[in-house]
Amino acid sequence: MAQAEAVQGKIVQCIGAVVDVEFPRDKMPKIYDALKFEGSALTLEVQQQLGDGVVRTIALGSSDGLRRGLIVTNTQAPITVPVGKATLGRIMDVLGAPIDERGPVDQTLTASIHRKAPAYDELSPSQDLLETGIKVIDLVCPFAKGGKVGLFGGAGVGKTVNMMELINNIAKAHSGLSVFAGVGERTREGNDFYHEMADSGVVNLEKLENSKVAMVYGQMNEPPGNRLRVALTGLTIAESFRDEGRDVLFFVDNIYRYTLAGTEVSALLGRMPSAVGYQPTLAEEMGRLQERITSTKVGSITSIQAVYVPADDLTDPSPATTFAHLDSTVVLSRDIASLGIYPAVDPLDSTSRQLDPNVVGQEHYNVARAVQGTLQRYKELRDIIAILGMDELAPEDKLAVARARKIQRFLSQPFHVAEVFTGSPGKYVPLSETIRGFKMIVNGEADHLPEQAFYMVGTIDEAFEKAKKVA
């Protein structure tokens, strides 16, 4: 097939990250077409057609040095990024260019970052549980293989640490591949993650093709266009592995920054903001991303997404829009973190559609509901205790409070990724042990133990051992 004739235009206006480019009227670029400059790595993505041959674009990179009259070439295709084995063990930016100083990425296989979600008849829902080794998650909000999970939390309650522990427990034991998309987060965290993966062998620095993870970063210091599109770049790589018939883990840190980048781009394009200043297309943008993160009859994508909650307000439009797309929600609470209980997961706020007796089994379901019931009773009694003290409670309420406090402490657990800070070795607790431990507490088999014996231990047997030392 003959090469399409190159269509060129020139810049007519440049305001920050927004660049207007004029083309011949009969050769206007399509929405999402990528435009390139000669001798520069900068790419523009078409967002609007203004008429009279002028298109409005967003710069995916710094627009410093751009001026009116510069010649721009239309690639006549959306942004494409390298996919497949060549991406394993590599760190790339939004355009698929390497940023790990380990040479170019093989471009033999490439794919457009914009594509339709799989058709309804191609989807394959899964009922299999994904064991994480984290007690509170496995008990009250279990993950589904091929499902979508959100880690919700305000600033500094442990979203990234929880995400790193999940990567540590799942990705290392997981025989498939992982893709990590760093969307608008700290560069330091991205760097730490890379070195952690290299130390654990998930990234094989000697033979990169034997690595099990691909990394795509568009960090906080980058222009909004990069932060908006980097999630799609990571997703495109994950989709290509899924379409090869593999089971893929897709980690996103942080979905809120994706929304925020969309807000910035929307404002730059002159759209009227909607509630709380967000873009009017918030639900559509979120849906377009989330609908592509799905499992088909060929392979699966299990996605774990950190979601920042501004001002700890879960009703904010950004986290509220994300909720609708998830199978499991893990809500991190500042109140629980302030008690020194980590992971600071709120067992009463976190949900999972997997917590169903037909999926997890009757025993698991009963224990989880009994744990939640005991904690809920403690929550209701807290005001009475604060005013009148423990002595005024009925004997059965005193017992419920004692058990709830033990459950609360038993929900804490030392993490592998936090060993450096805590000094205590991380614990991986199998699901069967988690159920056995909580069942014993709920049934009163651990009533004689002091509550500090349950703090920061793995299994219930460790709590019994610790009680002997405490005594």
From Swiss-Prot:
Cellular component GO terms, alphabetical: plasma membrane; proton-transporting ATP synthase complex
Main subcellular localisation: membrane
One Pfam family recorded for the sequence: ATP-synt_ab
SUPFAM superfamilies in UniProt: C-terminal domain of alpha and beta subunits of F1 ATP synthase (SSF47917), N-terminal domain of alpha and beta subunits of F1 ATP synthase (SSF50615), P-loop containing nucleoside triphosphate hydrolases (SSF52540)
Keyword annotations: ATP synthesis, ATP-binding, Cell inner membrane, Cell membrane, CF(1), Hydrogen ion transport, Ion transport, Membrane, Nucleotide-binding, Translocase, Transport
InterPro entries linked: AAA+_ATPase, ATP-synt_VA_C, ATP_synth_F1_bsu, ATPase_a/bsu_AS, ATPase_alpha/beta_chains, ATPase_F1/V1/A1_a/bsu_N, ATPase_F1/V1/A1_a/bsu_N_sf, ATPase_F1/V1/A1_a/bsu_nucl-bd
Enzyme Commission code: 7.1.2.2
Class of the enzyme per the UniProt entry, highest EC level: translocase
Reaction(s) catalysed by this chain's protein: ATP + H2O + 4 H(+)(in) = ADP + phosphate + 5 H(+)(out)
Location in or out of the cell: Cell inner membrane
MF-aspect GO terms: ATP binding; ATP hydrolysis activity; proton-transporting ATP synthase activity, rotational mechanism
Membrane topology: Peripheral membrane protein
Binding residues for ATP: 153-160
Annotated HAMAP family: ATP_synth_beta_bact (MF_01347)
UniProt subunit comment: F-type ATPases have 2 components, CF(1) - the catalytic core - and CF(0) - the membrane proton channel. CF(1) has five subunits: alpha(3), beta(3), gamma(1), delta(1), epsilon(1). CF(0) has three main subunits: a(1), b(2) and c(9-12). The alpha and beta chains form an alternating ring which encloses part of the gamma chain. CF(1) is attached to CF(0) by a central stalk formed by the gamma and epsilon chains, while a peripheral stalk is formed by the delta and b chains.
Job of this protein: Produces ATP from ADP in the presence of a proton gradient across the membrane. The catalytic sites are hosted primarily by the beta subunits.
Homology family: Belongs to the ATPase alpha/beta chains family.
Cited PANTHER family: ATP SYNTHASE (PTHR15184), ATP SYNTHASE SUBUNIT BETA, MITOCHONDRIAL (PTHR15184:SF71)
NCBIfam families named among the record's database cross-references: atpD (TIGR01039)
Name of this protein: ATP synthase subunit beta
Organism of origin: Verminephrobacter eiseniae (strain EF01-2)
